[in-house]
Amino acid sequence: MRCRGALSVFAVVLFVAVAAPEVSARPLTERGAASAPRNTALIAAVNTVRTAHLLPLLQVNANLSRAARSHSRDMLVHAYFAHGNFALRMSRFAVRGRVFAENLAWGRGVMSANATVAHWLASPPHRTVLLDPSLRRIGVATPIGAFGGFARATLVTADFAG
């Protein structure tokens, strides 16, 4: 969600999991070659939407990428789905800017970039983030691991700064 000043954050749960037997929360893929194509596809899908709305393309930022990767991994390992202390995370990863935002998503199996962006566009708070012209940088993480009672789930963190 979008944050200014004190960086107040609220969570919007995008996907709801159906109860299932508990499984290990250890991520199957945290980073590297396995998640790089998913990350690239997600950024491309977000930028396609921004282009269609005559907005500037988001540029990948290493600090935002590290923050997103850290948060997705933490949610997988500790089995929670929330923005957490977003302001502290931006500070910890030396993310600079006037405006910050974050979209989260998770789903069973491997989530496609287009499906993720379609869900965000259907949610007014997430749509606002995607179409915010003041946001200029992005970092994403799309690890796959046990989550929400499923042996295989994708947990998406997209962090933005302007």
Q: Where on the chain are the PLM-derived regions?
A:
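Disulfide-stabilized extracellular recognition modules
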Residues: S24-R26, V110-G162
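A short alpha-helix/helix-coil micro-patch that ends at or immediately precedes a cysteine
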Residues: R26-V77
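Surface-exposed patches in mature extracellular/periplasmic domains of secreted proteins
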Residues: A52-R66, A79-M90, R127-A141
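Short, surface-exposed glycine/acidic/tryptophan-bearing loops
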Residues: R66-M111
